[in-house]
Curated annotation (Swiss-Prot):
Keyword set, alphabetical order: ATP-binding, Cell membrane, Membrane, Nucleotide-binding, Translocase, Transport
Top EC class, one word: translocase
Sites where the protein binds ATP: 40-47
PANTHER family (alphabetical): ENERGY-COUPLING FACTOR TRANSPORTER ATP-BINDING PROTEIN ECFA1, HEAVY METAL TRANSPORTER
Species of provenance: Lactobacillus johnsonii (strain CNCM I-12250 / La1 / NCC 533)
Role according to the record: ATP-binding (A) component of a common energy-coupling factor (ECF) ABC-transporter complex. Unlike classic ABC transporters this ECF transporter provides the energy necessary to transport a number of different substrates.
UniProt protein name: Energy-coupling factor transporter ATP-binding protein EcfA1
Subunit annotation: Forms a stable energy-coupling factor (ECF) transporter complex composed of 2 membrane-embedded substrate-binding proteins (S component), 2 ATP-binding proteins (A component) and 2 transmembrane proteins (T component).
Keyword Membrane: yes
Membrane topology: Peripheral membrane protein
Gene Ontology molecular-function annotations: ATP binding; ATP hydrolysis activity; ATPase-coupled transmembrane transporter activity
Compartments in which it is found: Cell membrane
Amino acid sequence: MKDNIVTVKHLSFTYKDSKVPAVNDISFSIPRGSWTTLVGHNGSGKSTIARLLDGILLPHDNPRTVINVDGIELTEKTMWDIRDRVGIVFQNPDNQFVGATVEDDVAFGLENRQVSRSKMQTIVHDVLEQVDMLDFQKSEPQYLSGGQKQRVAIAGILAIGPKLIILDESTSMLDPAGKTKILSLIRDLQNKNGLTIFSITHDINEAVQADQMLVLDKGKLLASGSPREIFENEVLIKSAGLELPLFYKVKNELIKKEIHIPREVNSEEKLVKYLCQLNSKM
């Protein structure tokens, strides 16, 4: 039986000032240790789901709703236990900073958990080293670059020892190079620490790297599956109003021209290499 760190059943949520559900009766699961990406347009309900998984919001619309995180069912009594297991990195790290220096900010969550001073110093040093920000521990967060700020935000999450990290559009304010570096860092941290990643984004090219994709539209879950399964379904992509990543655009055009593309060719790099090999045989 597959070990799911998150199980969601019949999740619905409507904000008090709205008559339309932000999330409308959706069910899904997130395998432990996986990278799952939720895609959809602005206003589709993505960030609402992030806040529901972390207990920032509590669902009341549907009595059948179940949110289970790491074996704990979310209720008003258990939401703090859930928050010990889940960390969220938001779009704008400035909104998360509370400390005067980088090390103070990373230590904030530990202070709230009454961690001893000596243990706190060890943890702060370790997580800043993991995100390559140890040289900036005495710096003021406001003077860091966008990528550096996200690294500090990630360190603050790592410090509390979560099982699940939610990336809520956390690379959307970075340039392409900065985005690539942060995503690569998170992948390395995932492998090193055995983390589960739940990435919320409208960047289709980011979603290609996931193990599993969820497609959301107007609060409804349209589909779930591997990136290959999602992006090879052109009808689904069109109905969700999404664009195909460059790799799939090129691949689909080649297939239409009756050029066979092996299943193992699943990235731009592999496609370029394969086409070069084909060209050399002509």
